[in-house]
UniProtKB/Swiss-Prot annotation:
Subunit comment: Homodimer.
Ranges of residues in domain Radical SAM core: 55-274
Pathway annotation from the record: Cofactor biosynthesis; biotin biosynthesis; biotin from 7,8-diaminononanoate: step 2/2
GO terms assigned for molecular function: 2 iron, 2 sulfur cluster binding; 4 iron, 4 sulfur cluster binding; biotin synthase activity; iron ion binding
Record's function text: Catalyzes the conversion of dethiobiotin (DTB) to biotin by the insertion of a sulfur atom into dethiobiotin via a radical-based mechanism.
Keywords attached to this entry: 2Fe-2S, 4Fe-4S, Biotin biosynthesis, Iron, Iron-sulfur, Metal-binding, S-adenosyl-L-methionine, Transferase
The species this protein was found in: Rhodopseudomonas palustris (strain BisB5)
Entries under Gene3D superfamilies matching the protein: Aldolase class I (3.20.20.70)
Lineage of origin: Bacteria, Pseudomonadati, Pseudomonadota, Alphaproteobacteria, Hyphomicrobiales
Protein name stated in the entry: Biotin synthase
Length: 342
């Protein structure tokens, strides 16, 4: 009996160029999300193979360079000064310490170093050390990503001039549900910063969180908002809520059905076919089987390391074991996709 080259057969199913669209309707997106599960996953995996190596996952590491004391009231966040989470506020880290952490992350297999500061927006005096961090990470041959809150046009330009590759600024959920999660800023504020970042020539990392009390419609609308931007975010992180004691949402949060989470990953892959879709926070609550389904649905990026800002992460040894079981290898191309750029 002749053997069948399954990888080649699977790739043969993905022999066309993915269609990039910015005009998705509510009805179209909802129909995809609610499609029979096998059909949804098949479509997402087929589209995934048109632009990416299906067995390679991009690895990032995230560091909190300034913890706590944030003026925003995000209902899920332990770093908000509005909530009693017993998390002390810290000063901005010394850039040398940040760069030291980036070296360790690179040695562990990370190709992108993400740095987060718990601010509503950075003050002008904060920009010099932040820029030093960006330049230091870039000097290591890594991609640099920052999340600092809302930016002015000038701050975005300074970051671009320093060589920042990505700016993370999540929209969290749908516009309709947003005020149930955050009241100190508007959904429009988020979109305004995304526009400034893109205008400055920085790539955008933008996604959301599942488990905030939203409905499936909100998940669909969140992704439709991103897919209908003039330029798709180059990275789309999908987080599962980790309820943190002392935050308002923790008191009412209910776990997300695993299949609903996987459906969200698949919809992101289908509507934004050339973006990295990141399986982000919440992996400690996911079984290996659930993570495998997420990769099958088109997730191709994770955070490595033991922590994500103030929440736990599986750690390198568990991720290596999972990758070995699934035949996945870390993507070591410093952000250049196997079949083209995002």
């Amino acid at each position: 009996m002749n053997s069948i080259d399954l990888p080649s057969l699977a790739q043969a199913l993905a022999d066309s160029t993915p269609t990039i669209r910015h005009n998705w309707t509510r009805e179209e997106a909802a129909a995809i999300y609610h499609a029979p599960f096998a059909d949804l996953i098949f479509r997402a995996q087929t589209i995934h193979r048109q632009s990416f190596d299906a067995n390679a996952v991009q690895c990032n590491q995230l560091l909190n360079v300034k913890t706590g004391g944030c003026a925003e009231d995000c209902g899920y966040c332990s770093q908000s000064s509005h909530h009693d989470t017993a998390l002390p506020a810290s000063k901005l880290m010394d850039p040398a310490k940040v760069i030291e952490g980036a070296k360790a992350a690179r040695d562990a297999g990370a190709t992108r170093y993400c740095m987060g500061a718990a601010w509503r927006s950075p003050k002008d005096r904060d920009m010099a050390p932040v820029i030093e961090m960006v330049k230091g990470v870039k000097a290591l041959g890594m991609e640099a990503c920052m999340t600092l809150g809302m930016l002015t046009d000038d701050q975005a330009k300074q970051l671009a001039d320093a060589g920042l590759d990505y700016y993370n600024h999540n929209i969290d959920t749908s516009e309709e549900f947003y005020s149930s999660v955050v009241k100190t800023r508007s959904f429009g504020d988020r979109l305004e910063t995304l526009e400034k970042v893109q205008d400055a020539g920085i790539k955008v990392c933008c996604g959301g969180i599942l488990g905030l009390g939203e409905k499936p419609t909100d998940r669909v609308e969140m992704l439709r908002t991103l897919a209908n931007l003039p330029q798709h975010p180059e990275s789309v992180p999908i987080n599962m809520l980790i309820p943190i004691e002392g935050t308002p949402i923790a008191a009412t949060a209910t776990p997300v059905d695993p299949f609903e989470f996987v459906r969200t990953i698949a919809l992101a892959r289908i509507m934004m076919p050339k973006s990295d879709v990141r399986l982000a926070a919440g992996r400690t609550a996911m079984s290996d089987e659930m993570q495998a389904l997420c990769f099958l649905a088109g997730a191709n990026s994770i955070f490595i390391g033991d922590t994500l800002l103030t929440t736990p992460n599986p750690g390198d040894s568990k991720d290596r074991a999972l990758f070995a079981r699934l035949g996945i290898t870390p993507r070591d191309d410093l952000g250049v996709h196997a079949h083209g750029n995002a």
